[in-house]
C-alpha cells in the first residue's frame, strides 16, 4: 500500500516458531513488536528477545499491523469489532484455522481494493484483511520456492511413521520426526535443489 512499516505499531498474536520469526524480522528492521501468547513461557521468551508484551485486547485495539500466528482461532467477531481503523491484518495459516470469521460477512462490507488486499468496513470500524485471512507466506512462490518441499516431505514421513506406529491408538500421544529423519530429508533436498544431482 506504499506505506513504511517502521512507522506502524506492530502486534503479534502467537509466539511459536513462526511468531518468533516474525518478531525477529521486525526487530532486525528496528521495529519493536508487541506480543501476546496464551503461554506465559512464550511471553517471557518474547520479552527476553526485547519485544513488548501485552494482553490480547490491547494488541488487537492498538496495533496498526497485526500478525496472527496461532493456528487456533486467534480472532473472533468481538475482536474484529475492536480493531483500530485502517489496520492491516496478516495471517500465516488458513483463515479456517486462524479466524472465527462466521459473522464477518454479515457485519462487514468487503471490498477488494488491490489484489489480495480486502477492506472490511461498517459504521463501527474498518480494516484490511490481507488474502481474506489466508496464509500470506504462500502468497508468492518466490517466498517459499523449493523450500516447501522440505515441509511437505517431513509431513509425508510423519504420516508414514504415524501409520506404522504401535502407539497409533493411544490417546494424548504426539509423534515427531527425529533429527536423523530431518537430516536425511535435508540432504536429499540439497542434492536435488542445490547440487542438481537428480
Model-derived features: positions:
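Generic hydrophobic/aromatic pocket-lining and core-packing "Φ" positions
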Residues: 22-23, 43, 80
